[in-house]
A protein has these predicted regions:
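A cross-family signal for N-terminal binding/gating loops and helix N-caps
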Residues: 1-195
């Protein structure tokens, strides 16, 4: 991250901003991650988007393209097994992510979910990604990243309706991040009963 002051690694792997040899699980690492996130938000590098909408994210690398929907899922979907797991998690990795999410007050690690084919969602993705993107750039590693936001409330409602018709979502990557988010969510609910 030399020469990249706004790299996300300053948040996700904040030990890079501390003395070499620091224990990766030292409380200073989580505090530095939180400090960096707040700094980047204050500087406008990262934006806390409070609107209720979805995004579409496409990556193109070596001629391969993949496009997905970016949104939030409820911890209740996980607890009620509508988000299906296929791996066990390790307690030490969960504790690390729990501390990170809790101290940063942000879930900074995406969880890659898949779902059974949905013609409705496919049609929405095609339609929405024909519009002007919010971001479109090629990173230093040659990967092209393109992001679109939904164009209307009715599109958001159509996506939400289509997801409600699915029996389940499946974790493809992010079992530890998902389990940790759920545990922090339950902790926060316990602390704020009106949540």
């Amino acid at each position: 991250v030399v020469g990249k002051p706004y790299s996300f690694l300053h948040i996700d792997k904040a030990e890079i901003d501390l003395d070499k040899g620091i224990d990766l699980y030292d409380e200073q690492v989580y505090a530095k991650a939180s400090e960096n996130l707040k700094k980047f938000e204050a500087e406008g590098v990262y934006i806390n988007d409070t609107s209720k909408k979805y995004y579409f994210y496409r990556q193109i690398m070596n001629g391969h393209s993949q496009t997905g929907i970016v949104g939030c899922a409820s911890i209740d979907d996980y607890l009620e097994n509508r988000i299906k797991k296929h791996e066990f998690t390790r307690a030490d990795k969960e504790v690390d992510r729990i501390k990170h999410v809790d101290i940063c007050s942000a879930h900074t690690g995406p969880i890659f979910l898949t779902y059974k084919n949905s013609d409705v969602l496919d049609a929405i993705i095609v339609s929405e990604t024909e519009k002007e993107p919010v971001y479109d750039f090629v990173a230093d590693d040659g990967v092209r990243h393109t992001v679109w936001s939904t164009s209307s409330t009715s599109v958001d409602e159509s996506i939400e309706s289509a997801f409600s018709e699915l029996d389940a979502l499946y974790i493809a990557d992010g079992h530890h991040r998902a389990a940790s988010a759920v545990k922090v969510g339950l902790k926060r609910r316990g602390e704020n009963t009106s949540h």
